[in-house]
DNA sequence: CGGTTTTGACCCGCGC
DNA sequence: GCGCGGGTCAAAACCG
């Protein structure tokens, strides 16, 4: 009897213990959940702070860029004079991005009439092409030099819209822009990006609306025409053409024009490299080809790029399907201290790395870019996972 | 229902 | 001046 009672006592005790254990476990779990919630709140706060900071920074950058563009033409004159004094090899007559000789008499008259207006307006339209790459942890001094070159080049970047722009934009708000472009007789710099990608609609950070498709005579594969739809008046266009019939074949994307609106984070990150390429191309008049080439090597150190002028369109072509390894880098490229992480669905492995440089075409297959974007994305994922 | 894509027609620069 | 061909328009279809 005693044994039975003892056993039943211990069974009851075990039951009580088990229940109390469960309660403790429950409490602990609740506490954990509470902690996670608190952390979640903190992260939310942090995220909103980061976003606020980013937005305010973006505003400041736009402001500063606007001011610098206004001042850059004066600065350019100053630098040109310095160049002359330094006996640099400068070919002033070469003006890539312009085709002044093609201006008709009719257009010349218009230019005379509105040239003063153009000088003022063009200052506001020297924004960078809205695409490019993200480059992290770059040597500050080198970047400063390059950015300086880019700014100077942007001052020269007076592009013209072709007749298609005249047709496409009929509202009066755009008329000034169109007249300006028409009168100067200039053609826009184009940047071609060749990338092997299964999806032709490369997400380069902007929103695009397809407005046409055409099969060219010389190429049986259709070419698609897209217009930037982030702003109703944005003049930026792109053409996408597949380079081969296979599904895996590369796409050639040709960008043309300047965005008239703030770019999203991805796009503004992307803007640096190709914008630099376009700008450097257009600054070919004031810098030697070797220095231009070297500068592009900094922005596109592991891929082929070429410069050409087709149909009076100065064109920078970036071939992301063909890795360009360090033997082709400029001598002073800081390979020893940093490296590059890039994976554009290219079968070739990226060079060995100790620091990260990231080219980030979101939508293309990129490899672990620890950019602000990805950090924010991770935060968002974590937050949504916890809620 | 609003935004996007499709697609035939049209425009116009350019070469001959 | 004419024809070719790249680029754009715009209405209809499609989609979420």
Swiss-Prot record:
Residue ranges of DNA binding: 197-264
SMART domains xrefs: WRKY
GO MF, one example: DNA-binding transcription factor activity
Keyword annotations from UniProtKB, A to Z: DNA-binding, Nucleus, Transcription, Transcription regulation
InterPro entries found in the cross-reference section: WRKY_dom, WRKY_dom_sf, WRKY_plant
SUPFAM superfamilies hit by this protein: WRKY DNA-binding domain
Gene3D superfamilies for this protein: WRKY domain
Highest taxon, organism lineage: Eukaryota
Protein name stated in the entry: Probable WRKY transcription factor 36
The species this protein was found in: Arabidopsis thaliana (Mouse-ear cress)
């Amino acid at each position: 009897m005693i044994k039975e009672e003892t056993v039943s006592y211990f069974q009851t005790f075990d039951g009580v213990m088990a229940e109390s254990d469960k309660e403790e476990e429950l409490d602990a779990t609740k506490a954990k959940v509470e902690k996670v919630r608190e952390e979640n709140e903190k992260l939310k706060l942090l995220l909103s702070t980061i976003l606020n900071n980013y937005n305010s920074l973006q505003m400041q950058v736009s402001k500063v860029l606007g001011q610098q563009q206004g001042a850059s033409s004066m600065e350019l004159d100053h630098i040109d004079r310095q160049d002359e004094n330094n006996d640099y090899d400068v070919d002033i007559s070469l003006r890539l991005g312009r085709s002044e000789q093609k201006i008709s008499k009719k257009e010349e008259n218009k230019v005379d009439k509105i040239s003063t207006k153009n000088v003022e307006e063009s200052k506001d339209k020297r924004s960078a092409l809205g695409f490019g790459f993200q480059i992290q942890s770059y040597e500050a001094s080198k970047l400063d030099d390059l950015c300086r070159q880019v700014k100077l080049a942007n001052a020269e970047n007076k592009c013209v819209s072709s007749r298609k722009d005249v047709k496409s934009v009929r509202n009066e708000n755009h008329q000034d822009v169109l007249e300006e472009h028409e009168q100067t007789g200039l053609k826009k710099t184009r940047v071609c990006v060749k990338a092997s990608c299964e999806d032709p609609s490369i997400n380069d950070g902007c929103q695009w609306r397809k407005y046409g498709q055409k099969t060219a005579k010389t190429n049986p594969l259709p070419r698609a025409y897209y217009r930037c739809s982030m702003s109703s008046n944005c003049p930026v266009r792109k053409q996408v053409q597949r380079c081969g019939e296979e599904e895996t074949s590369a796409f050639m994307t040709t960008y043309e024009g300047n965005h008239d609106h703030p770019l999203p984070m991805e796009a503004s990150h992307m803007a640096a490299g190709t914008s630099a390429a376009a700008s450097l191309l257009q600054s070919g008049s004031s810098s030697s080809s070797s220095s231009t080439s070297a500068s592009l090597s900094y922005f596109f150190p592991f891929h082929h790029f070429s410069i050409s002028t087709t149909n009076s369109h100065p064109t920078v072509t970036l071939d992301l399907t063909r890795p360009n390894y360090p033997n082709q880098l400029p001598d002073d490229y800081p390979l020893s201290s940093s490296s590059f992480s890039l994976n554009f669905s290219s079968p070739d492995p990226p060079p060995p790395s100790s620091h990260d440089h990231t080219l980030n075409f979101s939508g293309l297959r990129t490899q672990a870019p620890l950019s602000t974007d990805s950090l924010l994305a991770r935060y968002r994922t974590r937050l949504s996972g916890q809620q």
